Amino acid sequence: EGEISEEAKFINAVNTITKSNRNFKLESTDGMGFMTDLKNKEIDIAGKNILIVGAGAAVESILFRLVRSEPSKINILNRTKEKALRLCSNYPNHNVEYGCQEDAEYDIIINGSSAGLTGSFNPPKEIIITNKTIFYDLNYSLGKTPFCEWALEFSKSVHDGTGMLVNQAAQSFKLWFGVNPQIDRVLEDLKRLSE
């Protein structure tokens, strides 16, 4: 017998399984890891205009919690329009729409596409970037991802997915062992490795 969390069921993904007595519980900690990382970086979502590039599993895993933080609007761009439209249709009451608004000024730009990992990142031409724009790449690697390299041309507020990875793992650890692990040292070590 098992139980699946509302979040894991909604996003159709599981990354953590716990067992109590004879029952299994299936959960996804990716969204929590993402939101915890934003909180740790003092990035507030409420009332913000957000552009997300990509519509794959990583984006799906964060949207469930992202929309509940009451952004003003979320636009999703993807190479495969149908995939992005399907994702948008999951959130009919949360101002999540396909496409990029003409001359849109976004407070936060999130990259969830694999295009941000190899080669160069080609941003949508319609967006307006200011020195206050925050950039977040759900990808991570040793060194800077192409998305982060591009974003650093405009802003100092550029973040990769390392914090999300570590925070979602910490959440899984807490579910398994009932203990909040200390992650500061892990984050410092990973940052040092990627420089």
Where are these regions (language model features)?
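Conserved S-adenosyl-L-methionine
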Residues: R68-K73, E153-S157
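Glycine-rich adenosine-cofactor-binding loop
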Residues: S28, G47-V67, N78-R79
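Rossmann-like adenosine-cofactor binding region
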Residues: N93-H159
